[in-house]
Design a protein with these regions (language model features):
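A conserved SF2-helicase RecA2
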Residues: 453-511
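Walker A/P-loop NTP-binding motif
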Residues: 78-82, 97-112, 203-205, 236
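SF2 helicase motor core recognition
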Residues: 170-175, 224-226, 385-389, 411-415, ...
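Conserved P-loop NTPase motor "coupling/switch" region that bridges the ATPase
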Residues: 113, 130, 158, 184, ...
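Conserved pre-motif I regulatory segment
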Residues: 54-89
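Conserved helicase motor
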Residues: 123, 144-152, 167-172, 194-197, ...
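Conserved helix-turn-beta segment of the N-terminal RecA-like "Helicase ATP-binding" lobe
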Residues: 124-148, 236-239
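Conserved Helicase C-terminal RecA-like lobe
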Residues: 93, 99, 104-120, 289-313, ...
Length: 511
């Protein structure tokens, strides 16, 4: 095969007619050579004839954006353009969002699709998808359909190139989405569609037509067991699974007792065949990926948190009117705002005001589910640690906890067990209690439940996983829900000492 001027493919074939009879933009140039237009539709047809040719994105696309694609991202984008319905199982932190954006942009430029619908968790609608679209496809129009139904409908009617919406928001405006003509649907963290009996799954399935492009993305397919693959396969590769779930379950599981099932010996192969076509890169396979990747997840404050947060902020505005702001006062008030954001605030009398943490906890569970190894969670406040570990235990997520009041002997035992045993899966740590000297390379994901105000503590805490003995690429996830959290994380990212700039930061918050 030869590529001619990035426009055509010169193929050597025993029988050129097998191509010229089905591809209008092709012609035989000799008894065994055929020239074919190098387009998306022609390439799909050639692949259907078992003639392996590269995607035209490889030669005909100017890769847009602030950053050049890494090798695995180019390969992923190429794969997606060659499959109308497909899975992308690249691990979290490998940049699959950008790969999907480039692939979609290329298809738009080729006139194959008009616009794309992105369905994802609320926590990454803005911080991941909109941010990445602005970074990699800034020439495209982007909007987020979130809020009351009337607002969502108005946004959809505007027909942006990329429309971002949360899972359960799709049902509210499904008719509007169908009418708007979104011919590519990208589902991020697609494991939320594993249950083919759920209303969420049925709504999505009603939007997927034979001509619809559909890419399902998740780093952890069938994470809870082989039966989870059924709903995903029914969307992308329905011919690869039986019509009914129970028949699929019998294929991949066997009954141990009345309420217990176990995977069959060759269930992984069965799942692999069903979840096709698919591409997967682990972080370790991405040789040009940075050793440490940082991502942000947005978390909405609850109404209770917003009430207390705004009340305290207004009080701060009144107190500083005409007064000199000291670093001590600024640090104290900022600390209280961070406490409210995290889930528990301490009063002057030493009592604790506890807030609803369900929004933040739901996002944390998503991160844990996506992680292929163990997880460290850094939580600056003691009472929040108690709340969090209680909830993890209730949900069956094995965990251990390190706070300042845990003895040195107990810490050593907890660290040893975390490093050498299958459980606990999660270690919840107060940053000041274990930021230095400890090796915790059994984990490759670090979650900051809330930011620390110490640049040194932040760097040292992240270094617990990113150090000698770590065999995997690592991801740091920052959970953020309030203005003060976003500003503190931004300063930490830019390696600015928060303590040195605390007064300036305080003034910013009050503006």
């Amino acid at each position: 095969m030869q590529i001619i001027d990035n426009k055509a493919l010169l193929l050597k074939l025993r029988n050129p007619k097998q191509v010229t009879t089905v591809i209008p933009k092709s012609k035989a140039v000799s008894d065994h050579e055929v020239l074919v237009n190098w387009g998306v539709q022609e390439t799909h047809t050639l692949r259907g004839l078992n003639i392996k040719v590269p995607s035209p994105i490889e030669g005909r696309y100017v890769w847009t954006g602030k950053f050049a694609p890494m090798s695995h991202q180019r390969t992923t984008s190429s794969f997606l353009t060659m499959h109308q319905k497909a899975f992308c199982f690249n691990e979290a932190g490998t940049g699959k969002t950008a790969s999907a954006i480039w692939a979609a942009d290329f298809l738009m430029k080729q006139g194959i699709i008009k616009r794309a619908l992105v369905i994802c968790p609320i926590s990454i609608m803005d911080s991941a998808w909109r941010a990445d679209l602005f970074s990699f496809a800034m020439h495209r129009t982007v909007d987020i359909a979130y809020g009351p139904a009337a607002k969502r409908k108005k946004i959809i009617a505007g027909k942006p190139d990329f429309l971002i919406i949360n899972y359960d928001g799709v049902e509210i405006v499904k008719d509007d989405i169908a009418a708007a003509g979104y011919d590519l649907i990208i589902v991020d963290e697609a494991s939320h569609y594993k249950n083919a009996q759920s209303k969420r799954w049925k709504v999505l399935n009603s939007l997927v037509k034979p001509e619809t492009w559909l890419w399902l993305m998740t780093g952890t397919p069938a994470a809870q067991g082989p039966e989870d693959a059924f709903g995903l396969a029914k969307l992308v590769n329905p011919a690869g699974v039986p019509k009914f779930f129970n028949a699929w379950k019998d294929m991949v599981m066997y009954k141990v007792s009345q309420y217990r099932w176990k995977p069959k010996e060759h269930s992984e192969r069965t799942v692999h065949r069903a979840l096709q076509p698919a591409i997967r890169f682990t972080k370790e396979e991405c040789l040009d990926l940075p050793d440490m990747t940082y991502v942000k997840r947005d978390v909405a404050l609850t109404k209770q948190q917003e009430l207390y947060y705004n009340r305290l902020k207004n009080q701060m505005v009144m107190e500083v009117a005409g007064a000199q702001i000291t670093a001590v006062n600024a640090a104290v008030m900022m600390g209280k705002l961070l406490q409210i954001s995290a889930g528990a605030s301490y009063t002057e009398s030493g009592d604790t005001v506890q807030f609803d943490i369900n929004n933040r906890y739901s996002v944390l569970k998503e991160v844990i589910a996506e992680s292929t190894h163990k997880v460290l969670i850094f939580v600056p406040f003691k009472h929040v640690i108690d709340m969090l570990t209680a909830q993890l235990t209730k949900d069956g997520i094995t965990n251990a906890m390190i706070r300042g009041d845990v003895s040195a002997g107990d810490r050593t035992e907890i660290f040893k067990q975390f490093q050498t045993q299958p459980d606990p899966k999660v270690l919840v740590i107060q940053p000041q209690a274990a930021a230095h000297g400890v090796t915790l390379t059994a984990a490759n994901t670090v979650v900051w439940w809330a930011p620390t105000s110490s640049l040194e503590t932040y760097a040292q805490a992240n270094a617990r996983v990113h150090r000698k003995g770590q065999a995997n690429k690592c991801t740091v996830v920052q959970l953020q829900g309030s203005g003060v959290e976003r500003r503190v994380y931004k300063m930490l990212d830019e390696k600015i000492d928060v303590h040195a700039k605390v007064v300036d930061l305080y003034k910013e918050l009050l503006d």
